[in-house]
Amino acid sequence: MAYGGILNDADITAALEACXAXDSFNAKSFFAKVGLSAKTPDDIKKAFAVIDQDKSGFIEEDELKLFLQNFSAGARALTDAETKAFLKAGDSDGDGKIGVDEFAALVKA
């Protein structure tokens, strides 16, 4: 798993189960449940690198939609509403994508 050494598998499973229903995803509670909120800035940057699939230095809307699948291949895609809410919560400079510093701020929020 891409998060080996950063996150605990049991925490990942619990966090994914908590948002298994469509439109139940909340970034802040997910980051807390999965244990990312308590991690070091370095570990948060490593997590960002996993989510940034195209290695552009940003997490774009299409990568956010598939966010949960970074934690488990069988996880659902986020709904359009969840994706837009996630982007709005993390995109503090309004450029339509989430940079590493914005991601770290969202995780720690």
Swiss-Prot record:
PROSITE patterns: EF_HAND_1, EF_HAND_2. This is Parvalbumin alpha. Keywords: Acetylation, Calcium, Metal-binding, Muscle protein, Repeat. Ca(2+) 2 binds at residues 91, 93, 95, 97, 102. It comes from Cyprinus carpio. Belongs to the parvalbumin family. Disulfide bonds: none annotated. One of its GO terms (cellular component) is cytoplasm.
